[in-house]
Amino acid sequence: MSKLNAYFGEYGGQFVPQILVPALDQLEQEFIKAQADESFKQEFKELLQEYAGRPTALTKTRNIVKNTRTKLYLKREDLLHGGAHKTNQVLGQALLVKRMGKKEIIAETGAGQHGVATALACALLDLKCRVYMGAKDVERQSPNVFRMKLMGAEVIPVHSGSATLKDACNEALRDWSANYSKAHYLLGTAAGPHPFPTIVREFQRMIGEETKQQMLAKEGRLPDAVIACVGGGSNAIGMFADFIDEKNVKLIGVEPAGKGIETGEHGAPLKHGKTGIFFGMKAPLMQNSDGQIEESYSISAGLDFPSVGPQHAHLLAIGRAKYASATDDEALDAFKLLCKKEGIIPALESSHALAHALKLAYEDPNKEQLLVVNLSGRGDKDIFTVHDILKEKGEI
């Protein structure tokens, strides 16, 4: 029986109750078979093209870095059906569920984007869907909650702990432990127990593959850097995967610095966490001196996660990728700028990556560079959050 590698260097693994091991083994074997099955690959490709709208555009910005010698491109995952990159891998996993003969899907969601993507895939492929969501996130992401319900999903608010994404993850895992024989846990990011980090990366890698082809067609060369926000890390690993062997292309992930790293209110475990076991994997983790998990914080619900995917930890450890951070205020400024200068409303998550790209462009305006930001999602879901913040600041 062929197996995938469960670790990325020292990170990853499969730290789960024994009861879930057969379900994870089954998932791994189905994935290996599917990857070798041309009909599966063709169906996945057709769904991505005909239903989700791939390939997504690579848009050159016109105004936002006008006074610099930087050329800044945006990989437009915001244009994907469902509003974010999440749709890519959800369609892949949902097809795997059909192959396994299961009829129910369990999911967790933070910003609601993964929940929406799961709900639409379940509606399309006739699967029963229940989504766990932190009660706090249910409040701050009401449009996405209603979208999920419109598409037939059951949304279950989680009130335990900090009532955010990590608590939703724990509840979803509990549900799966009780119902694994008939239900599949459709994990929303490139984290969690093996084989999820590998499966999610492979079902997101078209982001980087398309970017590479589009960049060669537009500029005749590869970018100097690709930049993506990092919460759990799926949009970033989807962008990075095809560039890992291109040593001249910098890979830059941007974690949420929240109210400032020094305040402790952030979501940057890669640079400011300690290695621990959480959510079925060994990975960097925000924890206190007693080893208890600390609550993460970010203006964007989708980055509000105290850990990170194991491959990102490995890429940092071997020096292949760099990880920066952007504060709430920096992300908000980038959000406003893209709206005003380019007519694009980005997700607050993606705005963190954009903030770092703008920093690179303006810290040396005379430097010629070619940058790509993965615009991982659109900001419709965030307009009420932004409205309230700007009102509080007296800007509107």
From Swiss-Prot:
Reactions the enzyme catalyzes: (1S,2R)-1-C-(indol-3-yl)glycerol 3-phosphate + L-serine = D-glyceraldehyde 3-phosphate + L-tryptophan + H2O
A GO molecular-function annotation: tryptophan synthase activity
Residue positions where N6-(pyridoxal phosphate)lysine is found in the record: K86
EC id: 4.2.1.20
Record InterPro entries: Trp_synth_b_CS, Trp_synth_beta, Trp_synth_beta/beta-like, TrpB-like_PALP, TrpB-like_PALP_sf
Key words, A-Z: Amino-acid biosynthesis, Aromatic amino acid biosynthesis, Lyase, Pyridoxal phosphate, Tryptophan biosynthesis
Gene3D superfamilies referenced in this protein's UniProt entry, alphabetically: 3.40.50.1100
Segments forming a coiled coil: none
Organism superkingdom: Bacteria
Pathway the protein contributes to: Amino-acid biosynthesis; L-tryptophan biosynthesis; L-tryptophan from chorismate: step 5/5
The keyword Ribosomal protein appears for this protein: no
CDD domains with a match to the protein in the record: Trp-synth_B
Cofactors named for this entry: pyridoxal 5'-phosphate
One family name in Pfam for this protein: PALP
GO CC annotations on file: cytoplasm
Family: Belongs to the TrpB family.
Job description of the protein: The beta subunit is responsible for the synthesis of L-tryptophan from indole and L-serine.
Oligomer and partners: Tetramer of two alpha and two beta chains.
HAMAP family: Trp_synth_beta
The protein, known as: Tryptophan synthase beta chain
Species of the source: Francisella tularensis subsp. holarctica (strain LVS)
